[in-house]
């Protein structure tokens, strides 16, 4: 059968479902009927959501929605980095950094790209200076302008709205899903049906023909998009596509989460996500106006649910008997194929890795971008589906390996969880990257150090998502450094001297921003009209 796709059925709501409805509705320009079928009693997961910088350019700009508009509707705040706390020192779970070598046990994974000097990234000069005893300053504070403004809870935008650094967002996933529901149904003509799928009918070729709901209604379509979450209602249950478990790389499989009130006037609003190391995993903290979302991601092999709840609540001084808690079990891995026949899985029905680097929302719109790029007709050309599947496989596996490196290279060995992470095997590609890093080479160095060009070109960023800046922030932050400085620097005496001016310029920029930027709380009150 040939001819264009006329009908699309999205099964599942939540953030993934409504992002899919909005993105496809915009991309297809009214040439296909889109229906979103959502069970009325399925809760939306997520207690606070953190993102990455290309969300605006790759998703909201594509929809034509200004940043300030959706931010106000979704109680959104800004995120300039991830702050990793206590990933190097042994002890109880606490949001306060312990002492490490005379300073705090924390490091920032900031957005942005490392600057280059004489075609060598600044990271390599920093390590050369550190190796020769010329500096004891941590990598993040030496090479990036952001850490000092993060310490002071400054805004990444001035009160006139101008942007001074790269940033992402924190928001309430429920509010984003609701905002996109209104946008998709009111502006793009997406049909919204609340009903539960009871049966999936496949045709003689193995494709999905229709779904029947609990009320007896039948919905047929040319293309089915599975946004049903961890259930994988269409892709796994109906299409019987196997889910590839990745617990041999990542141990965490559970979470307990909640929201906590916060006194912004007294304490300010933090412009970063916190990732706090715990006995059997780690805890996120996602600040928003008046509260923060938080959750303990842990391994059920090393902590029972009761033990995790107790450790989590003790850290935030919460009563586990009265505090509303969201208890989550999740599968870590990806489908063997994200797209099978006329069924495409998007979001957690396709793949999932713990949110240590805030990739959940990114996985959704990256998959939507690839779906539109490889959009089929009714013949379902296997070349398109195979290419799409390779892109999703690479995206996930690359992120899985980067996340694993956080645990594998943490020097913590004080609990069975941290020791067990050292016994896992790194993927061959990841081991190659580490070997390059230790030999003084850059990993996935972008073609340019211009962050605006990098974040403004989704295709370029997708191909080079975890680059040298990311690896250096995390590996150096964990205390893993190259075996010796880059051999090239021994032949560049003028560059190794003149780079002092570059590091000095970073310090000047830090001082200027610290003196001139408003607090994030002040900026958000102006933006949100509070």
Curated annotation (Swiss-Prot):
Its EC number is 1.14.19.9. The active site is at 79. L-tryptophan binds at residues 357, 454-455, 461, 465. It catalyses: L-tryptophan + FADH2 + chloride + O2 = 7-chloro-L-tryptophan + FAD + 2 H2O. FAD binds at residues 13, 15-16, 39, 41, 49-50, 197, 348, 361. Gene3D superfamilies: FAD/NAD(P)-binding domain. The keyword Oxidoreductase applies. Keywords: FAD, Flavoprotein, Nucleotide-binding, Oxidoreductase. SUPFAM superfamilies: FAD/NAD(P)-binding domain. Chloride binds at residues 359-360. Belongs to the flavin-dependent halogenase family. Bacterial tryptophan halogenase subfamily. The reaction between FADH(2), Cl(-) and O(2) produces hypochlorous acid (HOCl), a powerful oxidant. HOCl is proposed to react with an active site lysine to generate a chloramine intermediate, which chlorinates the substrate. However, studies with the tryptophan 6-halogenase ThaL (AC A1E280) suggest another model: the conserved lysine would not form a chloramine intermediate, but it may protonate HOCl during the halogenation reaction. This is Tryptophan 7-halogenase RebH. It comes from Lentzea aerocolonigenes. The lineage of its organism: Bacteria, Bacillati, Actinomycetota, Actinomycetes, Pseudonocardiales.
């Amino acid at each position: 059968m040939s001819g264009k796709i006329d009908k699309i059925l999205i099964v599942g709501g939540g953030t993934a479902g409504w992002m899919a409805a909005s993105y496809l509705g915009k991309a297809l320009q009214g040439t296909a009927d889109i229906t979103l079928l959502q069970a009325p009693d399925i809760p939306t997961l997520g207690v606070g959501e953190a993102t990455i910088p290309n969300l605006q350019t790759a998703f909201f700009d594509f929809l034509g929605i200004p940043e300030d508009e959706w931010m106000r509707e979704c109680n959104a705040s800004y995120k300039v980095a991830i702050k990793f706390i206590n990933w190097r020192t042994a002890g109880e779970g606490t949001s306060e950094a312990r002492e490490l070598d005379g300073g705090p046990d924390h490091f920032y994974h900031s957005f942005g790209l490392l600057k280059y000097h004489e075609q060598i990234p600044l990271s390599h000069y920093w390590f050369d200076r550190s190796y020769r005893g010329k500096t004891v300053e941590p990598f993040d504070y030496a090479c990036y302008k952001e850490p000092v403004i993060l310490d002071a809870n400054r805004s990444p935008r001035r009160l006139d709205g101008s942007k001074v650094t790269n940033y992402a967002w924190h928001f309430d996933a429920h509010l984003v899903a609701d905002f996109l529901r209104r946008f998709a149904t009111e502006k793009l003509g997406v049909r919204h049906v609340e009903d539960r799928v009871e049966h999936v009918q496949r045709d003689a070729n193995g494709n999905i023909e229709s779904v029947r709901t609990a009320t007896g209604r039948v919905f047929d379509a040319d293309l089915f998009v599975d946004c049903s979450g961890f259930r994988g209602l269409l892709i796994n249950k109906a299409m019987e596509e196997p889910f590839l478990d990745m617990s041999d790389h990542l141990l965490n499989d559970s979470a307990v989460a909640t929201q906590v009130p916060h006194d912004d006037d007294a304490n300010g609003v933090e412009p970063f996500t916190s990732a706090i190391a715990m006995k059997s995993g780690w805890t996120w903290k996602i600040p928003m106006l008046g509260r923060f979302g938080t959750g303990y991601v842990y391994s059920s092999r090393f902590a029972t649910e009761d033990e995790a709840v107790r450790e989590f609540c003790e850290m935030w001084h919460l009563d586990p008997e009265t505090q509303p808690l969201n208890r989550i079990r999740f599968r870590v891995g990806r489908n063997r194929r994200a797209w099978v026949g006329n069924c495409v899985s998007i979001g957690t029905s396709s793949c999932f890795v713990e949110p240590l680097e805030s990739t959940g929302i990114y996985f959704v719109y990256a998959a939507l971008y690839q779906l539109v790029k490889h959009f089929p007709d009714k013949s379902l050309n296997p070349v398109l589906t195979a290419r799409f599947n390779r892109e999703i496989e690479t995206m996930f596996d690359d992120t899985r390996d980067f996340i694993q490196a956080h645990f594998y290279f943490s020097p913590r060995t004080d609990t069975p969880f941290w020791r067990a992470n050292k016994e896992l095997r790194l993927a061959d590609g990841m081991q190659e990257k580490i070997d390059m890093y230790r030999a003084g080479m850059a990993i996935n160095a972008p073609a340019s150090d211009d962050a605006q060009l990098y974040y403004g070109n989704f295709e370029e960023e997708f191909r080079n998502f975890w680059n040298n800046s990311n690896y250096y922030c995390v590996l150096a932050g964990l205390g893993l450094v190259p075996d010796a400085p880059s051999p090239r620097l021994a032949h560049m005496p003028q560059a190794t001297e003149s780079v002092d001016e570059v590091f000095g310029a970073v310090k000047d920029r830090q001082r200027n921003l610290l003196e001139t930027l408003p607090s994030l709380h002040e900026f958000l009150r102006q933006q949100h009209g509070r």
